[in-house]
């Protein structure tokens, strides 16, 4: 399965994952308004991976299948501090 990844023009470190070729039809208008202009950054072949930076490919595929998209938000400040201290 191919997946397109878009970066938000309004929110730093915020990404929207969509099935390849999807025209944002499953993304709520409110979310698109807050997301801003979507800049495509890459296309990922999920068949070649098990893990992404913040979630498993299995979880991502579940979101894409059930919701039609996945919104990746920046990690919370506490999560960053824990990762730095490891």
From Swiss-Prot:
It holds the Pfam family YcgL. Gene3D superfamilies: YcgL domain (3.10.510.20). InterPro entries: YcgL-like_sf (IPR038068), YcgL_dom (IPR027354). Residues 1-85 form the YcgL domain. SUPFAM superfamilies: YcgL-like. This is YcgL domain-containing protein IL1825. It comes from Idiomarina loihiensis (strain ATCC BAA-735 / DSM 15497 / L2-TR).
């Amino acid at each position: 399965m191919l997946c397109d990844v878009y970066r938000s023009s309004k929110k730093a470190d915020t990404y929207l994952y969509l099935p390849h070729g999807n025209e944002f039809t499953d993304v709520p208008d409110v979310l698109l308004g807050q997301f801003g202009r979507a800049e495509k950054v890459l296309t990922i072949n999920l068949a070649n991976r098990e893990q992404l930076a913040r979630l498993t490919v299995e979880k991502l595929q579940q979101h894409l299948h059930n919701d039609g998209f996945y919104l990746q938000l920046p990690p919370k400040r506490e999560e960053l501090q824990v990762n730095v201290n490891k």
